[in-house]
UniProtKB/Swiss-Prot annotation:
GO terms for biological process: cell division; regulation of division septum assembly. Gene3D superfamilies: Cell division topological specificity factor MinE. HAMAP family: MinE. Keywords: Cell cycle, Cell division. It comes from the Bacteria. The keyword Cell cycle applies. This is Cell division topological specificity factor. The gene is minE. Prevents the cell division inhibition by proteins MinC and MinD at internal division sites while permitting inhibition at polar sites. This ensures cell division at the proper site by restricting the formation of a division septum at the midpoint of the long axis of the cell.
Amino acid sequence: MSFLSFLLGQKKSSASVAKERLQIILAHERGRGDSPDYLPQLQQELVAVISKYVKIDPEDIKVHLERQDTLEVLEVKIEMPQN
């Protein structure tokens, strides 16, 4: 089935595209070794994407990167409105 999907040009899900972008960003930052300057831009893009589906306040999304030795943890907290 995946070969047919490739030939027919079916779109990737937004989740898989976002995952790939985050992996690229993290790999790039690991190579540089300095502080992550992409976090504000990442937060803005997350607000834009989530706002397409749910009305949220930009302050409801928190992005934090924690580094310990060889481990990096990207933490994203999103407060969803009560419906």
